[in-house]
């Protein structure tokens, strides 16, 4: 596109007429305004040209501003700058929201203005991610959740509700958006982050076969290129390209105001000269060189849709489950079988043959300390029955799982009957094949637990405080109860779980599976207990030790797995040493051979496993509560006995004791008053001020305004 400074007066007049239908009454041709003067327009110059309507002035000045910024944005705009802009707007919005929503009945104006700024930054990033490089060659579908999060944010700000709940929801949404931005900046290759857009001119004989989508902000994108478009031009036009100029008429819009050409004007210009069509497209070129750093996968901690990982859509072997960036020298890799309906530009690369899996000796558990090849599928390792312990099956990260069948945040309820009653924990769940994993965060290197869904049945659940509850039940082993945040999440999970169960469920005549084949989990009871000994991403050495929260049957003395025997761990010194330490701990002895009791966490988890009856657990909890109450009352009674049995008790000494035990003294007076009221209703006495001989001593100064002072001897206990 030629510089605006070189535009002729005729071209300037044509561009001004294309801005809006309301500007058609102005004599733009009579102005004889060259391109250089167009860029210098201001409100005073428009007043001199008889453009007095403020709305018309805004339309023209906004378009001029867009022309000025078009070339400058090409040099500065990229994925990194747009992501950092959204991240900064999110942090600014968080700082404004904190403490502001609780003071006003309605949402303050400054909060709404900050929300509008946040929406503008999000729109700019999402429009950038709609380009062909990001929407077809790399999977950034996880980032589309930003749109859903901001729609939820808009609803929350306009709804009436408790201020604390509204502020908590807003901050949660902002943290989700910030997490997605951080993952883009950290996990995306440098080539994609710094890739800038370019302007490219394309000549077409006819606009037939070209589908253009217009957004609500009058921004025009190519959505589809049919076979009617000539081959040479079809290779130059890609889905996601933005239409900047049609037949030398700029149709772009200003970044934040609707000053671009409306769709009907754009279509009219396309059809004005069908014999020859010239387009200038703003597009992101496909890099020719591969990335220099090892590729990584984008993990979104707030994704609700089944597609999460940031991965290329190049063909792969059926057993290949590890996705990564692959910007090969071929600028147009072919689509994967899952994306056969998308546009394919260029030859399709040959699929990579899968590598044969490594064969381990029978009975040897996977060593947590040994490095693993990144091209091995974790699902393939997991399917090697009898070769891996339950702990090693959970030593797999979201990144290693690759593209999941379904993932998202769910609430997991503890097994009923805990000491503090049932509680819910928010976890990130990933359904891959027939296995359901859950993590504290999507970045964790080890799953907290896993369930073989094919051995369970899906049923609806009930809870007084949760609305969208469902559960996986088993005829023999304990159930797992979940709760979704919304009805959409519930429908998504139920649909995928039903598909998984029907696909992988064993026939009815199959023998019942063992407990270790059904589930494996880390049963950490309290977050406070976990904070001292656990981390969000434990190292392999920590993950292999039962002292770090793994209370699965392979790590508890109440239920031992036959796979962790000393005879099977003699292939290497490291495995043998690990097996010996695990065996000593399972046997209840220390490294020196001395008896060692169970840890509190192991004892509590084994108690919950032995008592699965909720009624029995509630009775036990009731007994323990009564025992604690009895213990506290005995301590209070001992304190009272000490003060009543003191032979040197004086008024001053008693007042000091009362200050130190004010709560106990108040309870004693209250109990004494109740006893007096009950006694007076049955026994009528003439002296209503006479005190019971067993009552607590009272401070003489405290009741001096109610009755005459008595002698000091009457305030002493009977034995003084």
UniProtKB/Swiss-Prot annotation:
* Chain segments carrying region Disordered: 285-390, 504-573, 676-720
Chief localization: cytoplasm
Tell me the PANTHER family matching this sequence: CONNECTOR ENCHANCER OF KINASE SUPPRESSOR OF RAS, CONNECTOR ENHANCER OF KINASE SUPPRESSOR OF RAS 1
Q: Which CDD domains match?
A: PDZ_CNK1_2_3-like (cd06748), PH_CNK_mammalian-like (cd01260), SAM_CNK1_2_3-suppressor (cd09511)
UniProt feature, compositional bias: Acidic residues: 518-530
Domain (CRIC): give its ranges.
78-164
> What's a single GO CC term here?
cell-cell junction
- List the keywords (alphabetical): Coiled coil, Cytoplasm, Membrane, Phosphoprotein
Residue ranges of every copy of the PDZ domain listed in the record? 196-285
Q: How is it modified after translation?
A: Phosphorylated on tyrosine.
Tell me the subunit arrangement: Interacts with RHO and RALGDS.
Q: How does it sit in the membrane?
A: Peripheral membrane protein
Task: State where composition is biased (Basic residues).
Answer: 379-390
Q: List, alphabetically, the PROSITE patterns matched.
A: CRIC, PDZ, PH_DOMAIN, SAM_DOMAIN
Q: Name one GO biological process term.
A: cell surface receptor protein tyrosine kinase signaling pathway
Q: Which residues carry this modification: Phosphoserine?
A: 307, 314
Q: What is the effect of changing residue 493 to A?
A: No interaction with Rho
Domain PH positions: 403-502
* Signal peptide coordinates: none
Q: Which domain of life is it from?
A: Eukaryota
Q: What does this protein do?
A: May function as an adapter protein or regulator of Ras signaling pathways.
The answer to whether UniProt assigns keyword Cytoplasm to this entry is yes
Its name, as the record gives it, is Connector enhancer of kinase suppressor of ras 1
Gene3D superfamilies in the record: 2.30.42.10, Pleckstrin-homology domain (PH domain)/Phosphotyrosine-binding domain (PTB), Transcription Factor, Ets-1
Can you say where in the cell this protein is located? Cytoplasm; Membrane
């Amino acid at each position: 596109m030629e510089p605006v400074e070189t535009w002729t007066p005729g071209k300037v007049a044509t561009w001004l007429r294309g801005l809006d239908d309301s500007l058609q009454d102005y004599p733009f041709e009579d102005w004889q305004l060259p391109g250089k003067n167009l860029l210098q327009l201001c409100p005073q110059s428009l007043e001199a040209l008889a453009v007095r309507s403020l709305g018309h002035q805004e339309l023209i000045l906004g378009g001029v501003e867009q022309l000025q910024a078009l070339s400058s944005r090409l040099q500065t705009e990229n994925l990194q700058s747009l992501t950092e802009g959204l991240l900064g707007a999110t942090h600014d919005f968080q700082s404004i929201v904190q403490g502001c929503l609780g003071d006003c009945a309605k949402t303050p104006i400054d909060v709404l203005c900050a929300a509008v700024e946040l929406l503008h930054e999000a729109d700019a990033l999402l429009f950038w991610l709609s380009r062909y490089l990001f929407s077809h060659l790399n999977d950034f579908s996880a980032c589309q959740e930003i749109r859903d999060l901001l729609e939820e944010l808009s609803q929350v700000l306009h709804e009436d509700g408790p201020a604390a709940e509204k502020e908590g929801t807003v901050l949660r949404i902002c943290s989700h958006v910030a997490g997605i931005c951080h993952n883009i900046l950290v996990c995306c290759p440098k080539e994609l982050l710094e890739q800038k857009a370019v302007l490219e001119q394309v000549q077409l004989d006819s606009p037939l076969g070209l589908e253009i989508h217009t957004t609500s902000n009058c921004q025009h994108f190519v959505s589809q290129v049919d076979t009617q478009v000539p081959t040479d031009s079809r290779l130059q036009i890609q889905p996601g390209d933005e239409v900047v100029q049609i037949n030398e008429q700029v149709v772009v819009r200003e970044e934040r105001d609707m000053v671009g050409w409306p769709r009907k004007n754009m279509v009219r210009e396309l059809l004005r000269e069908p014999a020859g069509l010239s387009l200038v497209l703003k597009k992101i070129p496909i890099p020719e060189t591969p990335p220099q750093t090892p590729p990584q996968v984008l993990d979104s901690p707030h994704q609700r849709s089944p597609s999460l990982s940031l991965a290329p859509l190049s063909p792969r072997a059926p057993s290949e489950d590890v996705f990564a960036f692959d910007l090969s020298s071929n600028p147009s890799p072919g689509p994967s079988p899952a994306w056969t309906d998308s546009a394919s530009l260029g030859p399709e690369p040959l699929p990579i043959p899968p590598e044969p899996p490594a064969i381990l000796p029978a009975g040897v558990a996977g060593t947590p300390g040994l490095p693993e090849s990144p091209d091995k599928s974790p699902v393939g390792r997991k399917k090697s029955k009898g070769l891996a312990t339950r702990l090693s099956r959970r030593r797999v990260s979201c990144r290693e799982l690759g593209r999941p069948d379904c993932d998202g945040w769910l609430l997991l309820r503890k097994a009923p009957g805990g000491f503090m009653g049932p509680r819910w924990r928010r976890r990130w769940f990933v359904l891959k094949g027939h296995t359901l994993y859950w993590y504290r965060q999507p970045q964790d290197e080890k799953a907290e637990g896993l369930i073989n869904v094919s051995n369970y049945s899906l049923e609806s659940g009930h809870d007084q405080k949760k609305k969208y509850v469902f559960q996986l039940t088993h005829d023999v082993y304990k159930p797992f109860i979940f709760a979704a945040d919304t009805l959409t999440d519930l429908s998504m999970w139920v649909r995928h779980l039903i598909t998984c169960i029907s696909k992988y469920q064993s026939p009815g005549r199959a023998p019942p599976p063992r407990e270790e084949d059904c589930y494996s989990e880390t049963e950490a009871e309290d977050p406070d207990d976990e904070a001292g000994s656990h981390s969000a991403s434990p190292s392999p050495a920590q993950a292999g030790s039962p002292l770090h929260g793994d209370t699965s049957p392979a790590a508890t003395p109440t239920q031992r797995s036959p796979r962790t025997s000393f005879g099977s761990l003699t292939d290497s010194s490291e495995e043998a040493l690990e097996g010996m330490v695990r065996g000593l701990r399972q046997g209840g002895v220390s490294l020196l051979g001395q008896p060692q009791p169970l840890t509190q966490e192991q004892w509590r988890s084994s108690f919950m496993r032995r008592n699965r009856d909720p009624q029995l657990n509630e009775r036990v909890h009731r007994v323990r509560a009564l025992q604690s109450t009895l213990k506290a009352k005995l301590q209070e009674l001992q304190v009272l006995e000490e003060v009543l049995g003191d032979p040197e008790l004086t008024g001053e000494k008693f007042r000091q004791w009362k200050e130190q035990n004010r709560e106990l003294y108040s309870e004693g007076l209250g109990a004494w008053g109740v006893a007096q009221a009950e006694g007076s209703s049955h026994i009528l006495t003439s002296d209503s001020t006479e005190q019971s001989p067993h009552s607590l001593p009272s401070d003489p100064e405290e009741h001096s305004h109610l009755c005459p002072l008595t002698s000091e001897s009457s305030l002493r206990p009977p034995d003084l």
